[in-house]
Amino acid sequence: MKTHLIKNFLKNKKIDFYLITNNDLHLNESPNLDLKDIYKLFKFDCTRGYVLFFIDKFIFFTDSRYTLAAKKFFKSNCEIYDLSETTIIDYLIMQNNKLSGALDSKLISVKEFRELNSKLEKNKIVIHPQFKNFFKKEYYPNFNISYTLSMPKYLIPRQFKDNLNKIKNNLKTEGILIWNNAHVAYLLNLRSFELWNSTKPFAGLFIPKKNIKPVLISNNSNLNKISKISKSFNIFREEKFIHYLKLSKFKNIETSYEFLNLNVYMCLSKFLNLSETRINISKYLGVKTSKEIKNIETCHIEDGLAVLKFIIDLKQKNIDPKNEYHVSEHLFNKRKEGINFFRNSFDYISAFDSNAAIIHYKPPPKKSLSCNNRQILLIDSGAQYLEGTTDITRVIKVGNKNFSKIKYSYTYLLKSLIKIENKLFSRNIKSSILDLYIRNYLSKFKIYYSHGTGHGVGNFGDVHEKYPIISSKSQDILTNNNLFSIEPGHYVEGQFGLRLENLYVTKNSNGGMKLKNITLVPYDLDLVDFRLITNFERKFIKRYHQKIYKLLESRLRDEYKRYFLKNLINKI
């Protein structure tokens, strides 16, 4: 997409602005770069972003994870707003003009458009959804380089037919249209690899109430190669699916407005009623079965082994990476040695010193910071294994200087994790209580962070699942066997950034609920100020490290064992 095409469009249509989202057709959090309009236009990558494009300027909106990175990237070329402080709606209303604008109807959800439009209309601001493009655009990933697999029976929690029947039994209409790729993958025990760092098929799913074949909505011919799919489903492209619904005389179906794009909704609304479903598939995914938990714990052994070897190699200078990007490549190569490793679960965040204060920093291959004279490394990484998905953040001391500020903050971040792991919470609490609990503790020591405290994690699926979200505004209810991250941090712009992240499973215990840590990577004791650590906390850290050593010992070479015992157990 070229800026002159947008300017010409605004002039020809006599409108004031064009709103650019960062979505793909299925509204995925992390679309492929070649499907992201913001990236194609500006070469800036983020998982959440919007651009208001005017003829004489553009305004960039993102969340706190990317504001610092955006300021460094765009410099003074545009205005940048943190969405938690100024929304797109806020900005447009502040202009005090009767503005009109447009957006691509295929790249915004029904829910988001309705919220946007209802508030803007009250202020006499009109936004027109566009159903035809004014420039050439590719909406689909490259299916030719993809492959698709049906999950092995020994790993799946339920047969796909049982999943479909559960949905059918809760339908209030003639059928449900599921547009979220992660939901399709999970319900059908299906994985596909056309989306980078993901395992989701780029497909929708229609489940009819009556006993006729469900429909997979996809352009991916690889799906036909899966026998259960070719036998049990019709596979239609989007246009053919819409025609099918019309010919079949469906009158009332349901969907999630949060996940369906506006274009599909408008096309279907011409001949049927499309209501908001009450079926919460995200919540369905968020509660793991005992089999899933066991599988996920298995993949964390593989992942812990890879990350541990990487950390020891880095500390012992057994590897000599040139820069931040090469550091992440070394870790990736360690993970590739793991049993049933498939791919990364997201682009690694590998950041030295002041770059670590950029919350979602992505190291460029050539221009990232060199390894010379650095003091700390923050590395946030994860992987997709056949048994599950991982996500972990550790901070590693790589220099010789002793920064009291860093040790102080790191120690209290570690103490906050120990505190939350030992707390007996009530059952069925809102996830926001965990967020409040850890923030209240850290605020006593003047440690704050602007991002959420955690997110759900998939089972060989999305690294960021929609349920549960651990944040101050979340209404999600925690039950037994939820899987999510807890990742408090502390960031000082221009100096350093710290974050510690583990994955936890909720477990009913003694009439309440506790968090079980399933991450198997030790903390860097060189960053711990033991003067601030209680005797209980010291023993807790030691037991955690001993547990890791016991699980990984048989697969460690002697030099790794010696380092672990000397520096990660006996030092405590």
Where are these regions (language model features)?
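Active-site neighborhoods and metal-handling regions in enzymes and metal-associated proteins
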Residues: 1-572
